[in-house]
UniProtKB/Swiss-Prot annotation:
Function: Has an important function as a repair enzyme for proteins that have been inactivated by oxidation. Catalyzes the reversible oxidation-reduction of methionine sulfoxide in proteins to methionine.
Pfam families reported in the protein's UniProt record: PMSR (PF01625)
Catalytic activity: L-methionyl-[protein] + [thioredoxin]-disulfide + H2O = L-methionyl-(S)-S-oxide-[protein] + [thioredoxin]-dithiol; [thioredoxin]-disulfide + L-methionine + H2O = L-methionine (S)-S-oxide + [thioredoxin]-dithiol
Keyword Isomerase: no
Molecular-function annotations in GO: L-methionine:thioredoxin-disulfide S-oxidoreductase activity; peptide-methionine (S)-S-oxide reductase activity
Gene Ontology biological-process entries: protein modification process
Keywords: Oxidoreductase
Catalytic machinery residues: 10
HAMAP family: MsrA
SUPFAM superfamilies given in the database record: Peptide methionine sulfoxide reductase
Name used for this protein in its record: Peptide methionine sulfoxide reductase MsrA
Organism listed in the record: Sulfolobus acidocaldarius (strain ATCC 33909 / DSM 639 / JCM 8929 / NBRC 15157 / NCIMB 11770)
Enzyme Commission (EC) number: 1.8.4.11
Record family assignment: Belongs to the MsrA Met sulfoxide reductase family.
Amino acid sequence: MEVATLGGGCFWCTEAVFKRVKGVVSVKPGYSGGKVPNPTYEEVCTDETGHAEVVQITFDPSVITYRELLEIFFEIHDPTTPNRQGNDVGSQYRSIILYHSEEQKKIAEEMIKLYERKLGKKVVTELVPFEAFYEAEDYHHDFYDKHKNYPYCKLVIDPKVKKFMKNFPDKASIRI
């Protein structure tokens, strides 16, 4: 098994998508990329901890590669806008890849260049070494699956899950 740590806006969105990927064993929402140990959601939302909302993904590389995970990652969020995804604004929503090895770093650098060419814009995704992951509070876990009728889920998360299912049908482990 391998681990990937990615932030692409609200972790409810990224968790909902990556939970549906074949080869993904677990997805945990949390905080990473900052300097404050054991931050709370409220602290992260102040923009003072330096942390981003991220997901930590444990995956089977014989089923899904790190490169394929990054392809999904870049397709389900906007990697060209700093500190924002849609109406979610703040540094905690920034696009960030926290690499766990030099191989992951190399692949991420290649994917950033690929998406800059593909999108015709500068990709602002931060690429930094993984240091620590702080798991989010329980109420953030499986948020989408527990609250599908919540307006945010219908308006923001549903389109991302549907886009993943449409663009990566061979990578989907379950339907909506």
